Amino acid sequence: MKFQARVLTLYPEMFPGFLGYSLAGHALERGIWSLETVQIRDFALDKHHSVDDTPAGGGAGMVMRADVLAAALDHCPQDSPRLLMSPRGRPFDQAYARRLADDSGITLVCGRFEGVDERVIEARELEEVSIGDYILSGGETAALVILDAIIRLLPGVMGNKASAKCESFENGLLEHPQYTRPSLFEGREIPPVLTSGHHKAIADWRQSQAELLTRQRRPDLYARYDKNRQKT
């Protein structure tokens, strides 16, 4: 079944962007997923195609209008999750991507300006999601990131299923270091265990390295991993 992605945006020309290349691009050509962009401005109510207005109560910037965005949302099918790109949203992670990849599609709303009128978020039950604790010029970049994370998990996109299972975050840890030829680079050798041919020793080394890296670089992830490990 084809995964259907819809993006509501003021800049449809930004899509598919880098998703037109590599794994996602090939999957798009093969029909594993489809992309529809919806120009929010097409649902404006005045001759100037206005989509924003000044914030109630005063303040800097402009706010996207609830009536215009609601009309754009109502134009789309209601059978898939509807996510609003927002820095105050739930953090996006690998588990979130896996859950979304199991659905039949997704609708992504790309905000601009100072934000979106809260009433349309409530009335259309938009799920706010964030890709990090920083501010972007608009939601389009975040939407592309989220789609990329989802698409690579769709059946048939990655040639080797084991590749996805061994990546960072899939087992609660960062990925172990990777090496390839040449065997010697500027005086640095590939760890001998990786060329030993002993599969269990290699697996044990990779596991220990993944745990070490996670403990050093992401103590928050390691604490969660260690807690889950103690439960099993």
From Swiss-Prot:
Transmembrane segments: none annotated. Gene3D superfamilies: 3.40.1280.10, tRNA(m1g37)methyltransferase, domain 2. Belongs to the RNA methyltransferase TrmD family. One of its GO terms (molecular function) is tRNA (guanine(37)-N1)-methyltransferase activity. S-adenosyl-L-methionine binds at residues 111, 131-136. It catalyses: guanosine(37) in tRNA + S-adenosyl-L-methionine = N(1)-methylguanosine(37) in tRNA + S-adenosyl-L-homocysteine + H(+). Homodimer. This is tRNA (guanine-N(1)-)-methyltransferase. InterPro entries: Alpha/beta_knot_MTases (IPR029028), tRNA_m1G_MeTrfase_C_sf (IPR023148), tRNA_m1G_MeTrfase_TrmD (IPR002649), tRNA_m1G_MTases_N (IPR029026), tRNA_MeTrfase_TRMD/TRM10 (IPR016009). NCBIfam families: PRK00026.1, trmD. The keyword Isomerase does not apply. The lineage of its organism: Bacteria, Pseudomonadati, Pseudomonadota, Alphaproteobacteria, Hyphomicrobiales. GO terms for cellular component: cytosol. One of its GO terms (biological process) is tRNA N1-guanine methylation. Its EC number is 2.1.1.228. It is an enzyme of class 2 (transferase). Keywords: Cytoplasm, Methyltransferase, S-adenosyl-L-methionine, Transferase, tRNA processing. Specifically methylates guanosine-37 in various tRNAs. Pfam families: tRNA_m1G_MT. It is found in: Cytoplasm.
